[in-house]
Structure formats: structure tokens, C-alpha cells
């Protein structure tokens, strides 16, 4: 097994090796699990041989023994190389801030879009059916775009390797995925797979109809990094309005199973990754309901009661995350802490200087 050192380690004893950040170390996984007091035997990549049991140190052959701190650093990298799923809610929507009538606030008399507040996006992508479709498929606010990019930058800081990205067809989810990838500096290297099966529980759609989502062609025209070769597991036509809770749970369980099956543990990753052929994180950008409906079946947990589910979903903020790691030895997935911290901020209400300062 190949591990990468996250930190430098200077030898304290003659049988220890100088390790620099980024060095590759070859270790036997069985020896890792049997390590005593944090010590593990491995082979430095400088030997140019994965099978050589000893390493050259100051002209002499020695077994490589690392202190607990160095071992912990390598074990962190080892954990990062496990196949994992990061389920994320989209960023802040414009209608969350400005209400359902947000579009009426920023359309001129002749139907042209203008930015009525700095938290409105500077422009809207073009749709063949016109602006009206955005009422049922709202975009991110400018703060939502910032939130998404900030999360991507945080994932980059933690050296999280994202190898696949899936998104609900909702525009806010596609936009979130796009800006997370920009923060990760993976755009356009990793493309977004739009999966209609990831859409939220359709019972919650106020219009009592499935929104007319932007087509792949429209998303590409708007410069979204879409994987055109991807074939969805659930076509848009399979989404029905006012589906039952049981049907939604069944759909979510099926789609997460299909996604993880389509992303093998030894994926042929592009050459820009530090470890070609090793597993990475499957990023899924969807809705607040997705955090439970996707991760619970993956972790082998039963679905929640529909009333408890509805109450729980209301507590999930923009960019809320759940993280599952595959435990190969036990052939199961386990929910663990996400690789980055939560994003918390306060409200910033509209300000009218005339009414506030002059009292008019």
C-alpha cells in the first residue's frame, strides 16, 4: 500500500528515516494494523523498488521505523484514500432571501432582468422557455455562489481528492457543484454528472409539477461543466409530482446504490491526481432532504418516520454536509465527520438609508 507523508519528520534515532512532506512510503497494511505503539515498518520510495524490505540510510541498510507522529500523518492520508461519499446541500437560493416573488422584483416592464439588490446574480442563464421558468427553478444568490466557492477552497486546503461529482438537475445544485469545483481548482478537469434521481421529494414542489429544468445544451451554453457522456439512472420522465414518502425513500436508496456501484474503488483517475488509480471522494450536490435519504441507506440505517423527516430537513442549512466512508474490511459504509468545518453566518437585512437616517 502506498501512503504519502503529510508532514516532515526528522529522525530521532539511527533506525528512523528522514521524511519530507509529500514523500511516498510503501507499507504492508497487515503490519499497519499490528503496529505497536504507533511504529510501523515500511519502504521509502527512494529505493525505487516496492518489494525491497530495507532502505538505504547514510550508506547502511536499516528497517524503516516511524514515530507515532509520522505514523499518524500517514494514517490520515490512508483514510483520505478510502472511497467516500460527501453529500452536500446547495447554497443559498435567491427565493430564500427575497421570497417566491423574487423574479418580479428584478424584471423591467419589457421583461428584461436587472439586479435589484447586490445579492441577486449579475445575470441569469438563457432558457428557451424564458425567465418564467426560474420561479420554479431558482438560481443561487451571490452569497450562495460565495458559500459554494468557499467550501471548495476549504476542501482544497484539506487536500480532499474529489474524483466524481453528481448533481440534482435543479439549477441551484448545478451552480453549487460548479463553484465548489472552482474552489477546488478542478474545473473543468472533473465534470458534473446531472442525475434527475437526486431531485428532492416532489411532494414539496409548490407548483404541483416537476420544474422545467435547464437542458444539457442550455447548461453547456451557460458554461457549466457538464459531463455530456453521462447517462442518468433516473430519466426526468420518471419523476412524478406528489410522490409518496415511501417512493421517495425507495428512489433515493436506489440512486445512491447505483452511484456508488458506478464509481469503483479502483477508479482510473485522470493523471493530475497524486495517486492515479486510487479511490477518491464522490461529491453529491442535492437538497436538504438528500442528506438523510442518501446517507442512511448507504450506512445501512432505516429510513426515518415521514413526520420526523420533515422536521429534520428544516434544520439543515445551506451547504450542510454528511460524509460516509467505505469500510472495506467490514463491507459497509460508516458516517463520519465531514472533512471541513460548517459554514455559519448571520443575516444581513435590506437597508433603506432614507427611512432609517432621515426618518422620512
Stretches with model-predicted labels:
Residues 1-4, 12-23, 34-37, 80-82, ...:
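Eukaryote-biased feature marking scaffold/signaling PDZ-domain proteins and nuclear chromatin regulators
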Residues 1-65, 69:
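Src homology 3 (SH3)-mediated interaction modules
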Residues 5, 19-27, 40-42, 85-90, ...:
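Structural signal for hydrophobic/aromatic residues that build the beta-strand cores
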Residues 9, 68, 76-189, 249-252:
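Active-site-proximal alpha-helix that buttresses catalytic centers in soluble enzyme cores
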Residues 10, 14, 24-32, 36, ...:
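Short amphipathic alpha-helices and their capping/turn residues within compact interaction modules
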Residues 57-84, 94-103, 200-218, 265-266, ...:
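Acidic, low-complexity terminal tails and accessory targeting/binding regions
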Residues 130-139, 223-247:
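Short glycine/proline- and acidic residue-enriched helix-loop micro-motifs
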Residues 161-169, 193, 267-276, 281-285:
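Short glycine-rich phosphate-binding loop at a beta-alpha junction
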Amino acid at each position: 500500500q502506498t501512503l504519502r507523508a503529510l508532514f516532515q519528520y526528522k529522525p530521532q534515532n539511527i533506525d528512523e528515516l528522514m521524511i519530507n512532506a509529500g514523500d511516498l512510503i510503501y507499507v504492508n497494511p497487515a503490519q499497519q494494523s499490528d503496529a505497536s505503539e504507533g511504529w510501523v515498518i515500511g519502504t521509502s520510495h527512494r529505493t525505487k523498488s516496492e518489494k525491497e524490505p530495507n532502505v538505504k540510510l547514510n550508506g547502511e541498510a536499516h528497517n524503516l521505523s516511524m514515530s507515532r507522529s509520522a505514523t499518524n500523518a500517514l494514517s490520515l492520508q490512508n483514510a483520505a484514500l478510502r472511497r467516500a461519499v460527501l453529500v452536500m446541500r446547495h447554497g443559498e437560493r435567491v427565493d430564500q432571501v427575497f421570497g417566491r416573488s423574487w423574479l418580479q422584483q428584478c424584471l423591467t416592464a419589457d421583461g428584461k432582468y436587472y439586479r435589484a439588490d447586490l445579492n441577486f446574480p449579475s445575470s441569469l442563464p438563457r432558457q428557451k422557455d424564458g425567465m418564467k421558468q426560474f420561479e420554479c427553478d431558482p438560481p443561487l444568490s451571490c452569497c450562495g455562489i460565495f458559500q459554494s466557492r468557499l467550501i471548495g477552497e476549504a476542501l482544497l486546503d484539506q487536500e480532499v481528492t474529489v474524483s466524481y461529482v453528481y448533481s440534482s438537475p435543479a439549477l441551484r445544485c448545478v451552480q453549487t457543484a460548479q463553484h465548489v469545483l472552482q474552489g477546488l481548482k478542478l474545473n473543468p478537469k472533473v465534470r458534473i454528472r446531472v442525475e434527475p434521481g437526486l431531485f428532492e421529494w416532489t411532494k414539496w414542489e409548490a407548483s404541483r409539477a416537476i420544474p422545467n429544468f435547464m437542458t444539457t445544451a442550455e447548461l453547456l451554453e451557460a458554461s457549466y461543466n457538464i459531463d455530456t457522456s453521462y447517462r442518468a439512472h433516473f430519466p426526468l420522465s420518471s419523476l412524478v409530482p406528489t410522490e409518496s414518502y415511501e417512493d421517495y425513500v425507495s428512489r433515493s436508496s436506489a440512486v445512491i446504490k447505483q452511484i456508488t456501484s458506478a464509481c469503483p474503488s479502483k477508479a482510473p483517475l485522470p493523471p493530475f491526481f497524486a495517486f492515479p488509480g486510487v479511490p477518491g471522494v464522490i461529491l453529491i450536490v442535492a437538497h436538504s432532504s438528500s442528506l438523510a435519504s442518501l446517507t442512511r441507506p448507504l450506512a445501512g440505517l432505516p429510513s426515518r418516520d415521514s413526520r420526523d423527516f420533515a422536521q429534520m430537513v428544516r434544520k439543515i442549512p445551506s451547504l450542510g454536509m454528511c460524509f460516509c466512508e467505505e469500510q472495506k474490511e467490514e463491507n459497509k459504509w460508516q458516517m463520519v465527520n465531514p472533512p471541513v468545518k460548517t459554514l455559519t453566518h448571520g443575516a444581513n437585512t435590506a437597508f433603506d438609508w432614507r427611512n432609517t437616517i432621515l426618518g422620512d
